[in-house]
Amino acid sequence: MSSQKSSHHKADSKMEQDNNRKAWISQPSGLNFVWGGDSRYWVIPKEPRMPAELKMVSWLEVTGSFDKIEPGKTYRIGFKISFKPDATGWDKAPVFMSAKIGKKGKTVWKRIKSVSQNFGILKGGSEPVNIPDESDGLFEILVSPTALNQDTKLQFGLYEVWTGRWKTGLLIHEAFVQEV
């Protein structure tokens, strides 16, 4: 039996409640990173409040889940990101977010244009920003009022898997879920 290490990073912690922001927060260690188990591609911090650093990938897939949702309520989802000054590959990258309720739920997609449109400013060393931003519009998902006794885990993600171009320098500080 092989004890080979996975190429991917699997979430190892739950979301924490932030009462000031009225949100649930997932630190990078609480997210799943495709290629996150290989330090050539990602550096996933063990320390709290430190961002995950993208070294280099052509397939960006960062996912998380949240199970404290209630039927009939709406939830806003986002990520807090920044870029290293030497980040590359994001100026024409079609970044998307997705969300669905339960394994069999319908996936909702949203293009996050602010990443490519503001890439020059963002990689200039700005403070971390929330995506989607105001120019993208909010990303919200409604949990069906009839979802009682069904799989109601909110699954969400951040993706750029379409161009095949190498991307570097993304810092993911957290993901967040807020009841609206």
From Swiss-Prot:
Name of the protein this chain belongs to: Protein PHLOEM PROTEIN 2-LIKE A9
Region ranges (Disordered): 1-21
Domain of life per record: Eukaryota
Compositionally biased intervals (Basic and acidic residues): 9-21
GO molecular function: carbohydrate binding
Highest classification ranks of the organism: Eukaryota, Viridiplantae, Streptophyta, Embryophyta, Tracheophyta
Originating species: Arabidopsis thaliana
InterPro entries: PP2-like
Stretches of the chain forming a coiled coil according to its record: none
PANTHER family, sorted: F-BOX DOMAIN-CONTAINING PROTEIN, PROTEIN PHLOEM PROTEIN 2-LIKE A9
Pfam families referenced in this protein's UniProt entry, alphabetically: PP2 (PF14299)
